[in-house]
């Protein structure tokens, strides 16, 4: 394996993103091990690890050659971005837009291959991939816009998706017009485009991960609050639930979704059915 350049400040700055991505991927993996019913956490872990691999392959050239190494790096970035988009959409109960994600990802990779092997042009490769990633970000924003009962984390992810799309499209266009075009990789990793790309990616990836951490923590808290007022066997109110019932009936300190869950006719009928089933099992 050959190093792209000397171990200087530029390389050390470049290693910041893979380090952050590896750490975030490990955290999401641990969360998934404790919440196996949330497969999107495993997808997030894999996405961050693929992102780390993509950044490392930008600085280290494999024995297969520079062009195949760059293609492998961009492939890692594309799969990571697609997985991240799908995981965020899944987290909020939306159907994953496989057609839109697949079209944007495949179009970006196809354009990259064209301007890498058929008509070599580094500037167009940069534009093609950034436009594809910007499109993926806007797809996520469009899906989050129609989520019902949006809370702070949903709004934060929606804003971050818009900022990410703006970062990929507007920032790239401004810098390429101001400092481009780029003819080769000589000096590219010290350019203003690459420096801003590293810093913006590190910031946005951290903010997105923190938002998803908060969302996962809120899910656990809601589950614990619901379980604190119910009996796991019968589904009825437990002692704590009965003790708090007078306060709830007076409208003071109601737990989340208490009335909708326990006072609806459907819920009452369901609990009666559960009690009858349990009694039949005891008699049998």
Give, region by region, the residue ranges found by the protein language model.
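Hydrophobic alpha-helical transmembrane segments
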Residues: 195-210
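Active-site-proximal alpha-helical element of nucleotidyl cyclase-like catalytic domains
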Residues: 245, 282-284
